[in-house]
Structure formats: C-alpha cells, structure tokens
UniProtKB/Swiss-Prot annotation:
The organism's taxonomic lineage, starting at the top: Eukaryota, Viridiplantae, Streptophyta, Embryophyta, Tracheophyta
Organism: Capsicum annuum
Modified residues (Phosphotyrosine): Y203
Catalysed transformations (reactions): L-seryl-[protein] + ATP = O-phospho-L-seryl-[protein] + ADP + H(+); L-threonyl-[protein] + ATP = O-phospho-L-threonyl-[protein] + ADP + H(+)
Notes on how activity is controlled: Activated by threonine and tyrosine phosphorylation.
SUPFAM superfamilies: Protein kinase-like (PK-like)
Keywords: ATP-binding, Kinase, Nucleotide-binding, Phosphoprotein, Serine/threonine-protein kinase, Stress response, Transferase
PTM text: Activated by wounding and UV-C in a cultivar-dependent manner; phosphorylated in cv. Pungchon but not in cv. Subicho.
This enzyme's EC code(s): 2.7.11.24
Chain sites annotated for binding ATP: I49, G50, R51, G52, A53, Y54, G55, I56, V57, K72
Annotated family: Belongs to the protein kinase superfamily. CMGC Ser/Thr protein kinase family. MAP kinase subfamily.
Entry protein name: Mitogen-activated protein kinase 1
Amino acid sequence: MVDANMGAAGGQFPEFPNIVTHGGQYVQYDIFGNFFEITTKYRPPIMPIGRGAYGIVCSVFNAELNEMVAVKKIANAFDNYMDAKRTLREIKLLRHLDHENVIGLRDVIPPPLRREFSDVYIATELMDTDLHQIIRSNQGLSEDHCQYFMYQLLRGLKYIHSANVIHRDLKPSNLLLNANCDLKICDFGLARPNLENENMTEYVVTRWYRAPELLLNSSDYTEAIDVWSVGCIFMELMNRKPLFAGKDHVHQIRLLTELLGTPTESDLSFLRNEDAKRYIRQLPQHPRQQLAKVFPHVNSLAIELVDKMLTLNPTGRITVEEALAHPYLAKLHDAADEPVCPVPFSFDFEQQGIGEEQIKDMIYQEALVLNPEYA
C-alpha cells in the first residue's frame, strides 16, 4: 500500500462560497479566490488538490458517475496558441485511449456560452498522489513496489505506442498512483505521432528525462525516447534521487557521458546533424561505467534492464515489448493481459493549420460528445 493522505485535517472538507448560475445549470465556486464554474452534476465535497501555471485542480463528486473525480481548470486556455493546441490534443487523446494504466477521461465540461468562453474544465479519474511525491517522501519502497510500478508503466506505454503515439514527457510527476499502487500515465499535451523521418519540432520538456537524441536536436526521433525516460525514472525510483539532474543543456549531456561513456561513432550513426556530431567528438572521453558498481544496492536484474534502456543509440535501445519480457518483470509479465490499442490515433486534426477559433470550436464539440444534452 502507498500512504496517500488527502483532504483537510481530520477528514473535514471546508465549504467554499458558491452561487448557482445560468438558470440553475451551473454552480460557480470561489476556491481561495479562484472562480471554478462547473455543471450541477458536480457536487460537494469540493477540494483544491493541485495548482500549476495552467490553473487549479479540484476533487469533486460527480453525481452522474457516483464517484469522486479530478477537475482541472485551464484558465485563459486560448491566450496562447500552442497551449490551446495542447489542450485539444490531450482531450482527443484521452478520449481515444482506453487502458488501465492511462488516466481515464471522465468529462469535458461544456461552457455556458459557446462563443465567449475562455476557460476549459477537464474531469479525469481521481488518484491519490504521484510517483514524484512518493520518491520525495521517506516512505519505504520494496522491490515488489518498484517492479509493480515499472511493470504498469511499461504496460501502459505498450498500449500508447501501439496507438502510434509517443508520449514525449514521461517523468515521475506524470505517473499518478492510488493507495492500491495502481499507476496511470497522464499529461498527453506534448504527445506526437510516431512517424519516422518526419521533421518534428524541438520542444521543451523536463531536461532530466530527455533522451540523448533530443538533447542533440535529432528531428527524426521515435518512441525510443519514451524508453529512455522510463530508464531514468526507474533508477530514480531505486535510488530516491534523479539520475541525471542537469542544470542546463550542456551539463545534462556531460552527466550522461560521465556515466554512460562518450558516444562512439556507431553510437552516433543515427545522427544526421553534423554540428551535433562535431560537438560530441570534442567532448572529454569517458568510458561507460558499470551500473552495477555505481549502484551496488540495486537488484542485478533491474540494473541489466536499465542498462538496455539507457543505450545511447536509440536504434539499439530495448523496446517496450522486450522490456516487459525481461526476467526482472517475469513474475508480472503476461502477454495475454498487455493489450494494444485496436485503432491508431489520428493527429490529422493538427495538420490542417487550425486557428484559435477552430480549436475553441473543436473543444466545444468534444464537450458535446460527452454531454449531448447541452447540444
């Protein structure tokens, strides 16, 4: 069991000021100065459980589903074009993906005014905590915990990759957990299609979990970047601290080469960028260290698996399917219970050069699919 204490002290939920709006169809709560307007199928207790640059997340009771859910308010969702596209992408992806180890979409709350809305409310399954919080805590984690977390992450990733999707932003805080140790992957705002050789734009994600091909600006990366991130997360789970906590781009590459060795010419064979190759060739030479000696307390089979995940050349990196079949996960692996996505996800909606109003309308349509009575 993972200890995940939530709610206010003593289990009592505070009552937040609220008013009924739009002819009784909506309730607007004042959550510590944040307006939170949701349909009347959402009822107290309502509790803020997180906040970020995007806005606020509250747990609230969904009377239709008869369960507590997490509702994320994305404030001023259309002020930034890229952020608006991310929101639409995440909604469409979550509606397409249906897997035990991927966070489940419960609702996109329809806005009261179709043309004049600026905030987007997305409801998902409610989880208790995330892997980042668990790693930072002083809670003991057994070998069984670590195996189970890794197995579920890879099981979910197999499904995601089979849908022709690369997550691109795997990190401990994007892996949600409940008290039963169930793990669900979330935050698909940066996800991309898996199209080899297609020029994919550079983007900013958490540097510590970024594969070498991304650090070297390779534009034709594959789902192997997610496997690298899993390797980094795996070691952080075992070691209770980040494996490559680079202060900046250059420092990140240095940390990689100090542990995993300076890339050889064959390691660099995937790179087309001559500037990147020249940069690597002038780096100080480091041999690849034996992970078993650097981390003597870590299970030898776990080290063997991580070693295959942290292969500098992505073409030689272990695949998710191969990782699931590795001896470290033998007691959990069951190919018959590791489903794939029956229909690949289509990113076609992004190819049309859609404008802000189109994005807004598409999000509204997504809300209507889930709430036809508001059409």
